[in-house]
């Protein structure tokens, strides 16, 4: 991860073609970055555009935007794209620099007996299926630093102009998910739609948000026809989260604005949730049409819950 960030910074140039940062300066940043991860305090929070040492107040000489983009160059461990008939099984993934396994723009995918150990690693997602169809995912174990089992479907208006398939026809069952930000996690890339998902017979423990559905005001698309049933959740911060107010601080890309995404046709049956610190259910539509035209009036609809049991709900639940 450090090598890719250094290479990115070394290739940046000024308007006259000269190098923006010297090797000496780039090499000196290692300590800053390590301390930032250790105590969450090295990037200045007061509106300045430079990367600074908050202890001494000295300017480290690097733009914040360049640090953000360099950090985003960390490589994922395994990426497959535009493939048909994929089987991933009987492997262990340990401490990836970024995402663990991503299968994109593909069809007919099976993932079985994959063990992912990326807990406390930033963006250490477990198994991800982006713009892929006909996915079966079962008997896996994920102990992750970010989302455990995730989906995505492109972003922005440009996604509609491309021949990109929806993320659909997904069956996930008999998985054990531990730690992580989201157990079942769909979005925030929703531009071409995520739909027709059956998620069942799964145990989730110490997940921040067990069922996590997210989009941002400009990503567009939808999440629809999601069924969650026969699952057990313990020690979570929030059980169900549906929001169009999500933003990714590590994103290094920009896209043409799309109409705001919507969530509809969600069904949850026979789910037990024990130990909820905050919300049992949060549904948020980010609406601000007067101040921000990219946040028009929209609603999420047709959300059905049956035989849901909550226990030991916290004071904020």
Regions found by a protein language model. Give the residues of each.
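Extracellular/periplasmic carbohydrate-active domains that bind, remodel
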Residues: 1-317
């Amino acid at each position: 991860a450090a090598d890719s960030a250094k290479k990115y910074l070394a290739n940046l140039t000024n308007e006259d073609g000269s190098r923006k940062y010297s090797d000496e300066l780039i090499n000196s940043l290692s300590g800053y970055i390590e301390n930032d991860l250790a105590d969450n305090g090295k990037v200045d929070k007061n509106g300045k555009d430079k990367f600074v040492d908050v202890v001494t107040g000295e300017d480290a000489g690097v733009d914040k935007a360049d640090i953000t983009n360099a950090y985003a160059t960390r490589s994922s461990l395994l990426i497959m794209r535009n493939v048909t008939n994929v089987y991933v099984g009987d492997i262990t993934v340990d401490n990836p620099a970024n995402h663990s396994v991503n299968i994109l723009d593909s069809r007919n995918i099976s993932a079985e007996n994959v063990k992912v150990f990326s807990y406390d690693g930033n963006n250490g997602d477990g198994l991800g299926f982006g713009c892929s169809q006909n996915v079966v995912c079962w008997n896996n174990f994920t102990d992750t630093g970010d989302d455990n089992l995730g989906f995505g479907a492109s972003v922005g208006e440009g996604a509609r102009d491309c021949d990109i398939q929806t993320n659909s026809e997904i069956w996930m069952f008999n998985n054990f998910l531990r730690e992580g930000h989201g157990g079942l996690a769909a979005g925030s890339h929703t531009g071409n739609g995520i739909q027709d998902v059956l998620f069942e017979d799964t145990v989730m423990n110490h997940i921040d948000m067990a069922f996590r559905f997210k989009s941002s005001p400009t990503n567009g698309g939808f999440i629809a026809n999601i069924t969650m049933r026969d699952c057990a959740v313990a020690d979570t911060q929030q059980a169900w989260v549906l929001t169009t107010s999500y933003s990714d601080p590590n994103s290094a890309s920009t896209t043409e604005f799309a109409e705001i995404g919507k969530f509809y046709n969600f069904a949850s049956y026979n789910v037990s949730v024990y130990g909820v610190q905050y919300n049992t259910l949060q549904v948020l539509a980010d609406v601000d049409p007067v101040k921000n035209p990219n946040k028009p009036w929209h609603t999420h609809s047709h959300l059905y819950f049956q035989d849901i049991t909550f226990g030991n709900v916290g004071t904020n639940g």
